[in-house]
Curated annotation (Swiss-Prot):
Residues 463-526 are cytoplasmic. It comes from Homo sapiens. This is Reelin domain-containing protein 1. Residues 24-443 are extracellular. The chain crosses the membrane at residues 444-462. Residues 24-179 form the Reelin domain. It holds the Pfam family Reeler. Keywords: Membrane, Signal, Transmembrane, Transmembrane helix. It comes from the Eukaryota. Residues 245-271, 385-396 have a biased composition (Polar residues). It is a single-pass membrane protein. Residues 242-272, 294-336, 370-398 are annotated as: Disordered.
């Protein structure tokens, strides 16, 4: 009877262990979704500070619908795990997992694929997941992980760093807009600006990109315009229709110079939302003053388009009649407060991508040059009407020459400045080259002499060795008149000499066997 009871108890224990082992090897149960505790053992979890597992989130903030990569790294192998994303506010499960590693499967705790667990008991160490945020805002979240290293060793609810939700203001913190500068498009007419000026718009949000522009001054520009360097960090505001506007990131004001631009029918006029009335009045006054100059530039532009000889250079010439009007308009310009005033206007003339330099030589790929400067006073009316010209201008320049407005007589012409050569002087390098060669000549001569001496010594040594060991002499003395004679050379070789005439001998080198005759005389047998 006792034997049967023991067998029944053993069978029940085996079945319980098998069921628990099966549940452990095929993943966590849905019962563990709430507290994330393994249900197959009753042991206490390990201390949170003793675990060797880290949860890395590749982003610190997210927006609704974003996908966040999550990586679980461990210095030791483990078999089971349960991963969830929970809200920091109420600890509710949030989001779904869209990508899971091998040997794992998705779970459904409160919604489909909102948790991940293991699918087998294979050893695991590094796992990668992709979590997708819900479409509705849920606030800041954390990733919680429970890991089972062995049957009795596990860690529950290991937390990751907080992933904050992006708000509307923080999402656009890098693209905040500070429009403070009225800047028409490069190809925009002043008449279009005048027509759109009386209708101010409501404040709108425009994306901006922060850029750093290097200030490059043309030769002689500092003497002509009395330019002062200012910070070249500006904002580029993008408007609809691929239009861009430059503005200063701080609260700097801008003054407009005399603008003479080419017309373009595909450019839409754009105005800054924060526009003062007096700036509009000044812009309209500048338009009226430069109307004749604009007409002259327009006629010149059409003339150069019709004439194929001027298809690569657009010349912008201002008329003589508008010279005094420009001077008066510049004198009527309202003085701004001394707040590090910045002038950012556009150039008076725009050249095409190819210009003629020299005697018809075509120079392509012009480089735009930006000038930034600050002026604190009004330009004086003198011999030049271009004293109030733009201090920040994009001027195309070729590889060898630069084009800038001509001087004198108050007439805005196009001139060719002196040629600048950024490369070092080649003549100086050529003058220094023979000096280096002269310094190295004695060393080269000494090296050649030593080489010749060594070669001669080597040749003499080889000749001596050849004489000693290669040329062997054999001396034979014929003291007795005999037809045949045997002699031994100085090298120990035995030779046979045969007399074939009165003064003729034949030297034969051979091997001989000496035979002692019975008579007492020696005879050589060949």
């Amino acid at each position: 009877m006792r034997m049967q009871a023991a067998l029944v108890g053993w069978a029940c224990t085996t079945l319980c262990l098998a069921s628990c082992s099966s549940a452990f090897s095929h993943g966590a149960s849905t019962v563990a979704c709430d507290d994330m505790q393994p249900k197959h053992i009753q042991a206490q979890p390990q201390h949170q500070d003793s675990h060797h597992i880290t949860i890395h989130t590749h982003r610190t903030s997210y927006a609704p619908g974003d996908k966040i990569p999550v990586t679980v790294r461990s210095s030791r192998d483990f078999m089971g795990f349960l991963l969830q994303a929970r809200r920091v506010s109420d600890h509710q499960i949030a989001g779904t997992f869209v990508l899971i590693p091998p040997h794992s499967k998705l779970m459904t705790c409160f919604q489909e694929a909102d948790a991940v667990t293991h699918s087998d008991k294979s050893l695991k160490r590094n796992l990668s997941f992709v979590w997708k945020a819900p479409a509705q805002p849920v606030g800041d979240i954390k990733f919680l992980l429970s890991v089972v290293q062995s049957y009795f060793v596990y860690w529950a609810r290991i937390e990751s760093s907080v992933v904050s939700q992006q708000t509307h203001s923080s999402a656009h913190s890098d693209d905040r807009m500070e429009p403070r500068l009225l800047m028409p498009n490069l190809h925009q007419r002043l008449g279009d600006v005048e027509g759109a000026a009386p209708a101010p718009r409501t404040p709108i949000t425009l994306p901006q990109q922060h850029t750093h522009v290097f200030a490059v001054a043309l030769p002689g520009a500092a003497e002509e315009d009395n330019l002062d360097p200012v910070p070249a960090s500006i904002w580029v505001t993008k408007f609809p229709g691929d239009a861009e506007t430059l503005s200063q990131p701080s609260s700097h004001t801008a003054t407009e110079g005399s603008i003479n631009q080419q017309p373009s029918g595909d450019s839409n006029p754009t105005l800054e939302p924060s526009l003062e009335v007096h700036r509009l009045e000044r812009l309209v006054a500048l338009k009226r003053v430069s109307s004749e100059s604009f007409a002259s530039s327009l006629s010149t532009h059409h003339r150069t388009q019709d004439d194929p000889s001027f298809d690569s250079l657009e010349t912008c010439l201002s008329s003589d009649g508008g010279e005094q009007d420009k001077t008066k308009a510049s004198n009527r310009t309202v003085t701004q407060p001394p707040l590090s005033t910045v002038q950012l206007t556009y150039p008076q003339c725009l050249w095409s991508s190819e210009t003629f330099t020299g005697n018809g030589v075509r120079a392509s790929n012009p480089i735009p040059v930006l000038q930034t400067s600050g002026t604190s006073g009004l330009p004086a009316a003198g011999d030049q009407s271009e004293a109030s010209r733009a201090s920040a201008s994009f001027l195309p320049q070729s590889k060898h020459k630069e084009l800038r407005a001509g001087k004198g007589n108050g007439e805005g012409g196009v001139g060719y400045p002196r040629q600048t050569n950024p490369r070092p002087d080649i003549g100086l390098e050529g003058a220094q080259a023979p000096l280096g060669i002269q310094l190295r000549t004695p060393q080269l001569g000494i090296l050649l002499c030593l080489s010749a001496t060594l070669g001669m010594a080597l040749a003499a040594g080889l000749r001596y060795l050849h004489t000693q060991y290669c040329h062997q002499q054999t001396e034979v003395s014929f003291s007795e008149p005999a037809s045949d004679a045997v002699a031994r050379s100085n090298s120990g070789e035995t030779v046979h000499v045969r007399k074939i005439g009165e003064n003729s001998f034949v030297l034969v080198q051979a091997e001989y066997n000496w035979i002692t005759p019975s008579v007492g005389s020696k005879k050589t047998v060949l």
